[in-house]
Design a protein with these regions (language model features):
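Extracellular adhesion/carbohydrate-binding repeat motifs centered on closely spaced tryptophans
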Residues: 1-197
Length: 197
């Protein structure tokens, strides 16, 4: 008669738990340690003692997030009141610009999603305080209006034509000017209601 060790049901991996946490016994009886392993389609990471990791896990210069079940997460994760984006497929924490659907987001070097004004070294952008999504077109911040490039989202300055009207966005701040404006030796009047010339 075949031994129990050779029967198919005896050759399946198994999750085990003790007072320190969860670990996984491979079908051959070994335990994964200090590595990532795909189990039933989900990625898990194990520490040097073989225990399953949860929360933020570094691997080289890259961070990954594992939920309470230990499975690696991708997409948006809220942790400690901040939002993070984990790349679909790899699960790596994103930094810098990230496109999700039709919207762009900016992640700090710590991975936290930014909101409000951000300068990425090339231009100023405004990220919606509620969603973090890059704003394009007109946006009111405080009592001032700004115009963000409808294609790139970069803050525009100087003269801008929107529809049939011209607007002036102050260099330096980008705020829309109203009332009388002197530019290049000429005076212009910009509506105090709409800013249109």
């Amino acid at each position: 008669a075949p031994s129990d060790e050779l029967r198919p049901e005896a050759r399946v991996g198994k999750w085990l738990q003790d007072a320190h946490g969860w670990w996984y016994r491979n079908p051959d009886g070994t335990f994964p340690a200090n590595k990532a392993v795909v189990i039933d389609g989900a990625t898990y990471r194990f520490d040097e003692q073989g225990y399953m990791r949860i929360g933020w896990v570094p691997e080289g210069d890259t961070w990954f997030y594992h939920d309470a079940s230990g499975a690696q997460v991708s997409g948006w994760v809220q942790d400690g009141g901040s939002w993070y984006y984990l790349m679909p497929g790899s699960g790596a924490m994103a930094i810098g610009w990230v496109k999700d659907g039709e919207s762009w987001y900016f992640m700090r070097p710590s991975g936290m999603m930014m909101t409000g004004w951000v300068n990425d070294g090339s231009a100023w952008y405004y990220l919606s305080p509620g969603s973090g999504a890059m704003v394009k077109g007109w946006v009111q911040v405080g009592s001032s209006w700004y115009y963000m490039n409808p294609d790139t989202g970069a803050m525009m300055v100087g003269w801008v034509k929107d529809g049939s009207a011209w607007y002036y966005l102050r260099p330096g701040s980008g705020a829309m000017a109203t009332g009388w404006l002197m530019d290049g030796g000429s005076w212009y009047y910009l509506s105090t209601d709409s800013g249109a010339m």
